Amino acid sequence: EVAPVQPGQRARAGTAPTARTRPGRSVVLSCCLVSLVAVGLLIHAGLTGKQRPARQPRVHLSGKDLTGYAPHTVHFNYDVSEVEADTVFIGVDGPSVPLDKKKHTFSYFYGLPSLYRTRIIAHNRTLSTLQVLVKSRGWEANLDNNYELSPHVAFEKDKGRLYITPESIKPLVTTKDKIFWTGYRNVQDFDADGDNFTLETRIKSNAEEGGIRCFDTEIEVIGTRANCRITLVEPGCSNFIRLDISDVHKSGRTDDLSSFAQDYSGWGRVKVRVCDKKAEIFFENKLIHRLSYQEPIGAIKGITFWFKGVGSVDYVRLYNAQNQPVYEDDFEKPESAATVSRFAGE
């Protein structure tokens, strides 16, 4: 006996035919239906198999004088005419800039030495990339308070360290809260692999010599593919620590990085050792952190130091994968020191 179909319900497959339906006709209809479904599935499978992903628009990006010394201007050549987007951007240094799709030339001024990764962007996707290496002539320095600096502020040259006296930059500090950062950078081809190197240095920051509370200090190795950056602070300030090594990013707010809170009001020795994408950080010869990462850092192109307020660097030593020195500087010679860059916010 067949249960009646309730209003709004569909008959279940396999229910017996009613008395007004001839069995022969039902079988024929069922066979036809099965055949049509099978054909439909085959057609769908064929169409699906032939579908190809949307074609990536052809984008051209090249440049003239992609390597030079700061200050430096690069002239980019581009073609984004095939990109289906209302606005196409070029990311240089800082906020992305919209491109004129009808034109093919864009120039940009780089005030500070660094390795810059230029990108063509549309719909929040990177369509093309290009690197610009702006080198320094030895060590250069700048003060970061988002203002252009005077080119006449010099380092101390007779104490064997990188150091700017607070008095020499006091007229340049224009932020209302008097919070500023000083930085030292050396950008060049260091002939070392960012995934196999050792960096040794000695740093100092304290209130008496111009450091600002927590004495945040950043040490960064710049690679062609990614960067390696560590932060040190005084004890009690670990909330402000950042650790960025290639694709690994940690914050003192969400990770326990208290081992990076150290006393370097006198001199503190720091060593960063990377071997086969495994990084170890030492303070005063004691291992304070280790991690592994996946994405390569690439060839080393720069070393930078940033101090909250003013800080000192006693020496810098860089070794390659064979533990051979590829760069050393103890800042005993006057020519090791340099003047403050005029362009702190570029």
Feature map (PLM): residue ranges:
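Cytosolic/nucleoplasmic/matrix-facing N-terminal domains/tails
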Residues: E1-Q9
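Extracellular/lumenal mature domains of secreted and surface-exposed proteins
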Residues: R12-S168
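Extracellular Ig-like/FN3 beta-sandwich strand-entry sites
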Residues: P113-R117, G194-N196, S265-W267
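Secretory/extracellular carbohydrate-interaction modules
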Residues: G138-A141, S168-D247
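Carbohydrate-binding surfaces in secreted/extracellular proteins
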Residues: T201, D263-Q294
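Extracellular beta-strand elements of beta-rich domains used
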Residues: T201, V272, D314-L318, F331
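Short, aromatic/His-centered strand-loop micro-motif at the edge of beta-sheets
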Residues: S246-R269
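Flexible glycan-contacting loops in extracellular carbohydrate-active proteins
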Residues: L291-L318
